[in-house]
């Protein structure tokens, strides 16, 4: 459905995207995750044909975005972070205008609007001015215009930003329903949003694609956490010794709050993400005479992976 190959984009001296590549298959729900300023919105604008990359190619359903922008846009439903709503129009009037702009045949517009209204739960609000609706329902109107023309691809940029918890839950339920008929790319900086809605995550940091993984794969992996019962240690020697254990790929000081603990703490990543390194690490600690305080497996989460990538970028 989407193929992005070696895309680069700069704004003057600022490199927003560097050699970004990824693919999304039809029917997937994929999260584009990154901190503010990571390049997510730039990526989306390039995908939707509203911004040209400096280099690279982008195709949607086999059609080149740069060469056939209009044709690609006809296949995309797009909800930007700030939905382009006219507050003085009624919901029905706004959707009617959008149907006309989408070149939906006049004799079919009523049916298209009815389907979008039903899908987004707006039937009781058709005659109300958009400006009188709550932010949650205004977001529903934005989603209704995005799906009005029955797109094969739905691109959502921060769809729950600024909503209260109840509205967030409602919009997420709506997105799940919409994903049954469209491929969905969801851009967000909220980790829980990706965990709640997506099957797969792309992590973009400082304009670079740092990770591409199924959430189920992340949930099935773990690291070994080693804590030594000593106030001072030869950290470099410990790291070197741990790195020589068979099956170890990376050794680092533990991230987050553990760095502030009095006891030296190490995070050990296996080359085989599902391997249990604890027995081999225990043997090393015993043979080296290390004062072992704690040794355990620590399940990797989206948060731990994201924080690890963010701090090493």
Residues covered by each model-derived region:
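ABC transporter nucleotide-binding domain
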Residues: 170-270
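Conserved ABC transporter NBD signature motif
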Residues: 56-67, 71-72
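Conserved ABC ATPase "signature" region
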Residues: 96, 100, 107-125
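Conserved ABC ATPase signature
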Residues: 88, 129-136
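C-terminal coupling/interaction segments
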Residues: 269-313
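Catalytic Walker B motif of ABC-type/P-loop ATPase nucleotide-binding domains
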Residues: 154-158
């Amino acid at each position: 459905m989407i193929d992005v190959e070696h895309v680069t984009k700069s704004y003057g001296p600022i490199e927003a995207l560097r050699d970004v590549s990824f693919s999304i298959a039809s029917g997937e729900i994929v999260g584009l995750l990154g901190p503010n300023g990571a390049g997510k919105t730039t990526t989306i604008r390039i995908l939707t044909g509203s911004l040209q990359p400096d280099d690279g190619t982008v195709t949607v359903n086999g059609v080149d975005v740069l060469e056939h922008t209009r044709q690609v846009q006809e296949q995309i439903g797009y909800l930007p972070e700030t939905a382009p709503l006219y507050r003085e129009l009624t919901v029905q009037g706004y959707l009617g205008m959008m149907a006309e702009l989408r070149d939906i045949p006049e004799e079919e517009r009523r049916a298209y609007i009815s389907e979008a209204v039903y899908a987004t739960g707006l039937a009781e609000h058709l005659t109300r001015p958009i400006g009188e609706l709550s932010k949650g329902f205004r977001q529903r109107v934005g989603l209704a215009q995005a799906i009005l023309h029955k797109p094969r691809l739905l691109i959502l940029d921060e769809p729950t930003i600024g909503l209260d918890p109840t509205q967030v839950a409602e919009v997420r339920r709506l997105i799940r329903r919409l994903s049954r008929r469209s491929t969905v790319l969801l851009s967000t900086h909220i980790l829980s949003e990706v965990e709640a809605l997506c099957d797969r995550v792309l992590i973009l940091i400082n304009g670079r694609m740092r990770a591409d993984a199924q959430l189920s794969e992340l949930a099935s992996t773990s690291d070994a956490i080693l804590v030594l019962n000593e106030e001072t240690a030869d950290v470099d020697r410990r790291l070197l010794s741990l790195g020589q254990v068979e099956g170890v790929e990376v050794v680092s000081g533990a991230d987050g709050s553990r760095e502030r603990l009095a006891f030296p703490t190490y995070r050990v990543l296996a080359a085989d993400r599902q391997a249990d390194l604890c027995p081999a690490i225990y043997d090393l600690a015993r043979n080296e005479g290390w004062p072992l305080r704690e040794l355990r497996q620590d399940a990797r989460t989206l948060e731990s992976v994201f924080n690890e990538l963010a701090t090493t970028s």
